[in-house]
Amino acid sequence: MSTTPSLLVDDLAFAYPDGHQALFGVDLRLDRGERVALLGPNGAGKTTLVLHLNGILRGGRGRVEVAGLPVEDRNLREIRRRVGIVFQDPDDQLFMPTVGEDVAFGPRNHGLPEPEVARRVADALAAVDMADAADRPPHHLSFGQRRRVAVATVLSMHPEVLVLDEPSSNLDPAGRRELAEVLEALPVTVLMVTHDLPYALQLCRRSVVLDGGVVVADGPTRELLADADLLARHRLELPFGFDPTRV
């Protein structure tokens, strides 16, 4: 069995043009099939790190590889297929007249034949339990349904890594549960950026805490969330009365 990780970040450092240093030698490895939560306060460098994973940001020190393929100019088309990012607001990536056309957009843009596009659309919508919505306008769906369709737009590209930005935000309890059920069933590597610590515990056995542009903790989610001093140092808070050791 291959030991090549889905995602490898090695000594990644990055400064913006204004001189702000956002990352200081970040190391991160996600093995195939892992679901990992990326935790940290605002301004920790989480977004900067995520934007390196598919080559939107580059130019600093270190390297990023996706399933062994370096994130470099010559590989960007394939890298962006392999790393699918689902934004916090699903309306940022749903812009076609129907759900089916939104999910088909990526495969069509990659020049896949129409029978393959149709198969991928059907498979991706089935994976997020939205198979009956292909002909519906996205704006007729609930927020939670639109978020699941946004996931489907990425799944149709058969990614190696699925990156989720605050996936539980603005969801009601039923929407949280439905999305969790979808994510737990997906056969892809997942990196979940979130402030929702109970959701991280529900979905991810492992968590990485980033603060000040460095990884300050990496380990079992339950153990990290039970460390009150760690949470306090890095401005992470559990809901009142929530005990991660009892869930």
Residue ranges and their predicted role:
Residues 115-133:
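Conserved ABC ATPase "signature" region
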Residues 162-165:
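Catalytic Walker B motif of ABC-type/P-loop ATPase nucleotide-binding domains
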Residues 39-41:
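The feature captures the beta-strand-to-loop junction immediately N-terminal to the Walker
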Residues 137-141, 145:
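Conserved ABC ATPase signature
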Residues 62-70, 79:
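Conserved ABC transporter NBD signature motif
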Residues 214-237:
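Conserved beta-strand-loop-alpha-helix hinge in the C-terminal portion
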Residues 54:
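Helix-to-loop junction immediately C-terminal to a conserved catalytic motif
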